[in-house]
């Protein structure tokens, strides 16, 4: 694989890659070294106005393109993403820190997502409703909602853009994304594939800059008709409130803190392999990452020992280095957060079984950590750690574990391990989550719904349900005269 040199990132406005009107830029830092590797354009109001005007004109053009032609263009983009997967993955690892193997999987998965949405967009149908008056015709028509404003996080720079972008394009909407300024190059490479595939100017736009300034300007703007956001629950609530104030549709994919219930009859080796792998993927910086491990007391010690062994078997290092299985945390803020989690765990009497400390002084490396005997009042059992920390607590009855899993206001994802169909039935009925994986790691395929309940948001970014928020349903009745 040829090495890819990291370059500066520009804005995408009206089909052109441009600097900010002010010339302002922001440093991009490699989390594995702590050193700047490039710069990204910092959009101001003048840039946003240009991007909004382009999104409006792009929408008027794109909505007129037949669904099968939109799908063909999207498939061309998917093919280009696959061709460029190695290069895009290297950009991602340099700016985000995850191992190159994980970055490449993310990019290749993006191509699958594009193709699935391209095909699903061809199946957006209206319907004919039998009239009560035989002289009338009643039809239901689906139309694109309009220009979309998207706001995406740094933990999955490509995946979190492509889900929103694909749903928007498949339904005939234009799309303007404020992507993360900490990880700008890989989202730009994704959008470049769409430009090169022939998506018309203005249909897609890309800006970076101050999150509060950009969101407070885009969401109320009359051009924008749909808002979609992935990020923390507190910020999501603010953006959802702003969208509601201006009657904009919104999809919110927010914080998780996923429970993992390991029942008495579980296959411990399977549970450790599946949940452990999911826990330390992307250094735990995953909204659906398993975080609260609720393990039956009869197997708790066995499970803890096995998870510690799994964690200690990970190779921590620069994501570009061969064999690395756990990369740097994305930014210094995560190091501070991890230190706080560990300090609190010790203070309340939990046991640090492995890890619990920063590795080295260069880069944002933190040891994979397992905490046992965690009290319910520990921070790690109440606030999403968003890092490589697994917290374990025992239980005696499955109903107790379910109650604890549901105790928090979050409800994005959940995991369970059991051989009993009765347990599966109970877990399926009782766990308050939008996504549940039993006896396996997370598999968020594009054809399955992806979203949460309670404070974890609303709306879906997968399955046929993902297209509905981008569509307007129009009722048309015509009387023959």
Swiss-Prot record:
Q: What happens when the gene is disrupted?
A: Cells lacking this gene are unable to grow on L-arabinose as a sole carbon source but grow on a nutrient-rich medium or D-glucose at the same growth rate as the wild-type strain. Moreover, both the wild-type and the mutant strains can grow on D-glucarate or D-galactarate as a sole carbon source.
Which amino acid positions bind NADP(+), per UniProt? Answer: 154-155, 178-181, 231-232, 254, 384
What EC number(s) does the entry state? 1.2.1.26, 1.2.1.24
GO biological-process terms attached to the record? gamma-aminobutyric acid catabolic process; L-arabinose catabolic process to 2-oxoglutarate; protein tetramerization
Q: Which Pfam families match?
A: Aldedh (PF00171)
**Catalyzes what?**
2,5-dioxopentanoate + NADP(+) + H2O = 2-oxoglutarate + NADPH + 2 H(+); 2,5-dioxopentanoate + NAD(+) + H2O = 2-oxoglutarate + NADH + 2 H(+); succinate semialdehyde + NAD(+) + H2O = succinate + NADH + 2 H(+)
* UniProt KW keywords: Arabinose catabolism, Carbohydrate metabolism, NAD, NADP, Oxidoreductase
* Top-rank taxon, per record: Bacteria
Q: Report if keyword Transmembrane is assigned.
A: no
CDD domains, sorted: ALDH_F5_SSADH_GabD
**Sorted alphabetically, which InterPro entries does this protein's record hold?**
Ald_DH/histidinol_DH (IPR016161), Ald_DH_C (IPR016163), Ald_DH_N (IPR016162), Aldehyde_DH_dom (IPR015590), Aldehyde_DH_Superfamily (IPR050740)
Which residues of this protein are catalytic?
Answer: 253 (proton acceptor), 287 (nucleophile)
Q: Which GO terms describe its molecular function?
A: 2,5-dioxovalerate dehydrogenase (NADP+) activity; NAD+ binding; NADP+ binding; succinate-semialdehyde dehydrogenase (NAD+) activity
Q: Does the keyword Oxidoreductase apply?
A: yes
Induction of the gene: Induced by L-arabinose, and to a lesser extent by D-glucose or a nutrient-rich medium.
* Note from the entry: A.brasilense possesses two isozymes of alphaKGSA dehydrogenase with essential physiological roles for the L-arabinose and D-glucarate/D-galactarate metabolisms, respectively. The L-arabinose isozyme was isolated in PubMed:16835232 and is described in this entry. The other NAD(+)-preferring isozyme of alphaKGSA dehydrogenase is induced dramatically by D-glucarate or D-galactarate but not by L-arabinose.
| Job of this protein | Catalyzes the NAD(P)(+)-dependent oxidation of alpha-ketoglutaric semialdehyde (alphaKGSA) to alpha-ketoglutarate. Is involved in a degradation pathway of L-arabinose that allows A.brasilense to grow on L-arabinose as a sole carbon source. Prefers NAD(+) to NADP(+) as a cosubstrate. Displays broad substrate specificity: exhibits the highest activity with alphaKGSA and succinic semialdehyde as substrates, but to a lesser extent, is also active with glutaraldehyde, benzaldehyde, and a number of aldehydes from C3 to C8.
Q: How does it assemble?
A: Homotetramer.
UniProt lists the family membership as follows: Belongs to the aldehyde dehydrogenase family.
Stated name of the protein: Alpha-ketoglutaric semialdehyde dehydrogenase 1
Q: Which organism is it from?
A: Azospirillum brasilense
């Amino acid at each position: 694989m040829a090495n890819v040199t990291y370059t500066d990132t520009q804005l995408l406005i009206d089909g052109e890659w441009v600097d900010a009107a002010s010339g302002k830029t922001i440093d991009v830092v490699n989390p594995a070294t702590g050193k700047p590797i490039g710069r990204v354009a910092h959009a101001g109001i003048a840039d946003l106005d240009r991007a909004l005007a382009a999104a409006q004109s792009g929408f008027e053009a794109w909505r007129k393109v037949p669904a099968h032609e939109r799908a063909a263009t999207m498939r061309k983009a998917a093919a280009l993403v696959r061709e460029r997967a190695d290069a895009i993955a290297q950009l991602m690892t340099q700016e985000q820190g995850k191992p190159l193997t994980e970055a490449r999987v993310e990019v290749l998965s993006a191509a699958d997502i594009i193709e699935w949405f391209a095909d699903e967009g061809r199946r957006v149908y209206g319907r004919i409703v039998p009239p009560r008056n035989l002289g009338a015709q009643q039809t239901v028509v689906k139309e694109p909602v309009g220009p979309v404003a998207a706001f995406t996080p740094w933990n999955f720079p490509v995946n979190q853009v492509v889900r929103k972008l694909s749903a928007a394009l498949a339904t005939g909407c234009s799309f303007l994304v404020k992507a993360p300024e900490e990880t700008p190059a890989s989202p730009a490479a994704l959008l470049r594939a769409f430009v090169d595939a022939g998506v018309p100017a203005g249909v897609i736009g890309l800006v970076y800059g101050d999150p509060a300034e950009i969101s407070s300007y885009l969401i109320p703007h009359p051009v924008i008709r749909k808002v979609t956001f992935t990020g923390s629950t507190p910020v999501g609530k603010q953006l959802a409130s702003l969208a509601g104030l201006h009657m904009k549709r919104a999809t919110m994919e927010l914080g998780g803190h996923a429970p993992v219930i390991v029942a008495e009859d579980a296959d411990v080796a399977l549970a450790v392999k599946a949940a452990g792998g999911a826990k330390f993927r992307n250094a735990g910086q995953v909204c659906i990452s398993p975080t609260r491990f609720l393990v039956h007391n009869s197997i708790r010690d066995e499970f803890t020992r096995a998870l510690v062994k799994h964690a200690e078997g990970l190779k921590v290092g620069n994501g570009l280095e061969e064999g690395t299985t756990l990369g740097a945390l994305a930014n210094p803020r995560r190091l501070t957060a991890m230190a706080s989690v560990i300090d609190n765990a010790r203070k309340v009497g939990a046991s640090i079984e492995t890890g619990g400390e920063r590795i080295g002084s260069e880069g944002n490396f933190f040891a994979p950590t397992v905490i046992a005997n965690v009290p319910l009042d520990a921070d790690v059992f109440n606030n999403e750690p968003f890092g490589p920390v697994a917290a374990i607590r025992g239980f005696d009855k499955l109903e107790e574990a379910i109650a604890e899993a549901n105790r928090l206001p979050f409800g994005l994802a959940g995991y369970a391990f059991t051989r009993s169909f009765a347990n599966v039935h109970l877990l399926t009925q009782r766990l308050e989550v939008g996504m549940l994986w039993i006896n396996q790691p997370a598999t968020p395929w594009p054809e399955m719904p992806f979203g949460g309940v309670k404070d974890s948001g609303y709306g879906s970014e997968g399955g046929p349900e993902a297209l509905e928020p981008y569509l307007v349903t129009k009722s048309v009745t015509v009387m023959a005269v």
